[in-house]
């Protein structure tokens, strides 16, 4: 009887390498696939694509699997990076990893894997998939400190039905131990923390290569001008570093934070103190939705949500975003406690315990001064 073929997305990192080894040990016919999705290889200081490929080949040789490379650079720039720039141009702060997973790792990659005769794909993400009566659920990883379901919430039933997450039940510390025990050449390689497929590099410098700077006034929440910003795209809600203000503008000594943007007047608003009212929200509206089950929760459903990665789950109530709004497409969340720096462009992801329900892109968060939190319109990719 032939073995079930699984194509593993291999990045050259420890997680995907251990994933491939575990599946080989479980008897699968494992093929490794290395995705190249960014062409800027000349920027060797920050882009380690060549070294990553070398690591993938070394790991494949050690564990005894075939491996190949595939170039999705065109798909990445069209489906992910173009949207990334559009959102920043509109003053929002997108999360490229969310879109990258939905459009590249679990769409372009999945399609290519199927063309290689795979029955399933696997990645080194920390999450779990559970099947109940032919329906699939996306669950948090057992190790909640490493859970990545937030980035995977846009996966649908078809994608989850063909996906394995072998690390979902394993603590990260154990994954490192396995890598060292079996002698993986990349066992001590640090985890990647840069933009999906682009790598680790000074973010402001990178963004400046693609978006023009448009300086404008920097004002306090009471309208006093305290400086000049270099362009709204280069700041995000809740940002503290890189504003260029000390802690003494009002004598309190508290740090300054980005608290709002007015796109029409090109004004950046700053507030002093972590818990300033402009930084706190109890209600948000989100659109561009994706639901794991194929439909939204019932209006009035009590659940939990994250408005940024690594945030603790926050109790909330799911609602429609208006009297005539379809909550499958546009929804609101009402939080029991005020949430800090809820940021347009980021994902609001809903949970029932460990079960990820899906979510949407934050459009608006109600604060003490809603004028700067009006929905910031951007041309969104319909494919997302």
Swiss-Prot record:
Among the GO molecular function terms of this UniProt record, one is: tRNA binding
> Principal localization?
cytoplasm
Known catalysed reaction(s)? S-sulfanyl-L-cysteinyl-[protein] + uridine(34) in tRNA + AH2 + ATP = 2-thiouridine(34) in tRNA + L-cysteinyl-[protein] + A + AMP + diphosphate + H(+)
Task: Report residues binding ATP.
Answer: 9-16, 35, 124
Report residue spans for region: Interaction with target base in tRNA.
Answer: 95-97
UniProt keyword annotations, A-Z: ATP-binding, Cytoplasm, Disulfide bond, Nucleotide-binding, RNA-binding, Transferase, tRNA processing, tRNA-binding
Which GO terms are recorded in the biological process aspect for this UniProt protein?
tRNA wobble position uridine thiolation
Region spans: Interaction with tRNA = 146-148, 308-309
Q: Which InterPro entries match?
A: MnmA-like (IPR004506), MnmA-like_C (IPR046885), MnmA-like_central (IPR046884), MnmA-like_central_sf (IPR023382), Rossmann-like_a/b/a_fold (IPR014729)
Q: Which GO terms describe its cellular component?
A: cytoplasm
Cellular compartments annotated = Cytoplasm
Q: Name one Pfam family in it.
A: tRNA_Me_trans_C
Please name the NCBIfam families in this protein's record.
Answer: PRK00143.1, trmU
Function in brief: Catalyzes the 2-thiolation of uridine at the wobble position (U34) of tRNA, leading to the formation of s(2)U34.
The protein's name is tRNA-specific 2-thiouridylase MnmA
- This chain is encoded by the gene named mnmA
């Amino acid at each position: 009887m032939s073995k079930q073929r699984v194509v593993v997305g291999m990045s050259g990192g420890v997680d995907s390498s251990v994933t491939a080894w575990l599946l080989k040990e479980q008897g699968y016919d494992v093929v490794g696939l290395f995705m190249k999705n960014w062409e800027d290889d000349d920027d060797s200081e920050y882009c380690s694509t060549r070294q990553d490929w070398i690591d993938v080949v070394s790991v494949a040789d050690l564990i005894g699997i075939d491996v190949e490379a595939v170039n999705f650079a065109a798909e990445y720039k069209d489906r992910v990076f173009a949207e990334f720039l559009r959102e920043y141009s509109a003053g929002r702060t997108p999360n490229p990893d969310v879109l990258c997973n939905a459009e590249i790792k679990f769409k372009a990659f999945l399609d290519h894997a199927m063309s290689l005769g795979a029955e399933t794909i696997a990645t080194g993400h920390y999450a779990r998939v559970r099947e109940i009566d032919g329906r699939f659920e996306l669950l948090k990883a057992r190790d909640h400190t490493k859970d990545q379901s937030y980035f995977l919430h846009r996966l649908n039933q078809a994608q989850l039905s063909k996906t394995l997450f072998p690390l979902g039940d394993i603590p990260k510390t154990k994954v490192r131990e396995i890598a060292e025990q079996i002698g993986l050449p990349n066992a001590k390689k640090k985890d990647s923390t840069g933009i999906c497929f682009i790598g680790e590099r000074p973010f402001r410098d990178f963004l400046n290569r693609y978006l023009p700077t448009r300086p404008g006034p920097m004002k306090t929440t009471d309208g006093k001008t305290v400086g000049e910003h270099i362009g709204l795209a280069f700041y995000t809600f809740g940002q503290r570093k890189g504003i260029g203000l000390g802690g003494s503008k009002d004598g309190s000594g508290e740090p300054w934070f980005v608290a709002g943007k007015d796109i029409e007047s090109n004004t950046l608003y700053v507030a002093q103190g972590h818990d300033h009212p402009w930084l706190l929200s109890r209600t948000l509206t989100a659109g561009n939705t994706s639901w794991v089950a194929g439909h939204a929760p019932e209006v009035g459903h009590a659940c939990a949500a994250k408005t940024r990665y690594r945030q603790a789950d926050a109790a909330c109530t799911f609602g429609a975003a208006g009297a005539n709004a379809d909550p499958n497409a546009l929804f609101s969340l009402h939080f029991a406690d005020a949430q800090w720096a809820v940021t347009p462009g980021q994902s609001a992801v809903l949970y029932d315990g460990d079960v990820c329900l899906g979510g949407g892109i934050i459009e608006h968060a109600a604060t003490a001064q809603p004028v700067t939190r009006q929905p910031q319109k951007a041309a969104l990719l319909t494919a997302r």
